[in-house]
Swiss-Prot record:
This is Thiopurine S-methyltransferase. The keyword Membrane does not apply. GO terms for biological process: methylation; response to metal ion. It catalyses: S-adenosyl-L-methionine + a thiopurine = S-adenosyl-L-homocysteine + a thiopurine S-methylether. The gene is tpm. S-adenosyl-L-methionine binds at W11, L46, E67, R122.
Amino acid sequence: MRDPEFWHNKWAANQIGFHLEDVNPLLIRFWSDLAPKRSEKVLVPLCGKSEDLIWLANQHDSVQGVELSQIAVRSFFAEHFYTPTVTRLNAQHELYQFDELTLFTGDFFTAPVESVDLVYDRAALVALPEEMRAEYAQRVLQLLKPGGRILLVSMDYVQTELSGPPFSVPEAEIRTLFMGCEVRRVYQDTSIDPHLNKRTQAGLSRFAEEVWVIEKSE
């Protein structure tokens, strides 16, 4: 992943305003739109130490996450008093396993993740600059089984009015990134977003948080 030091430094300095202390209400509200089955495997790219992992592990037998920062993954297990089995896979990746959870540390693009049925992306696509997003979408679709589904949370604003991350990923780009898939927007909220402070949003001409259901063809 390009510029990994940016994210390593964020975690090292505990500058994690992107981290939610609770389960994302959009996950709770819209996960059922994927018609998920407990036996279906889930992937959470760039998972951080998200509480969403716990919620998903209560719904599914296998939840995989990939996170660049070891600090984030170790904090996740420590804060929940979990003691994972840790395996050094290679020079770039470690594997942390505990019950339904399997978390990889290291580069998402090279992590040895198993194929999955479902993907949950709240903070991955919007964390990547435009030049990396096509490669990311290609990697996600490579890992997604035929007929697999993605729940994607995105943001749409005028990029020149605010330097990301989180970056703006407008509808046209999402449809291009996932061309060949069925892409549906199931939610759009143009009110104040909790991830951006009010002063920041006051300088934006428009802002929307959106939720998408994306289905890969059989």
